[in-house]
Amino acid sequence: MTGETQLRARRTRIKILKAIAGLNRSAGFSEIRDATGLSTGSIYYHLERMNKYVTKDLRQYRITDEGLRLLSEIGVKSVVSN
């Protein structure tokens, strides 16, 4: 992966994390798609690689404590103060 591709992937994954965190730390796939504007394929691709930050429980994706820590570290405090 090139540096530019890695940066784009990170930005996409942060966008997904922010969307889930902003939806009370739990969201269905359609909610993630609507909140991010990303394609179905892109969301699935990234969610598969984010198991440290997002878990799937039945039909909901939930942000993990590690995902909340990451958002806090990058300065996204408004969505993680639950």
Residue map of PLM features:
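Short acidic, hydrophobic short linear motifs in intrinsically disordered regions
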Residues: 25-35
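A short, conserved structural fragment
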Residues: 51-60
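Conserved segment of winged-helix/HTH DNA-binding domains
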Residues: 67-82
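Short helix-capping/hinge SLiMs at alpha-helix to coil transitions
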Residues: 20-24, 57
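Short alpha-helical segments that sit at the start of domains
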Residues: 1-16, 40
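Short amphipathic alpha-helical interaction segments
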Residues: 37-49
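Hydrophobic structural patches
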Residues: 17-20, 47
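Short, basic, alpha-helical segments at the C-terminal edge of helix-turn-helix-like DNA-binding modules
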Residues: 60-66
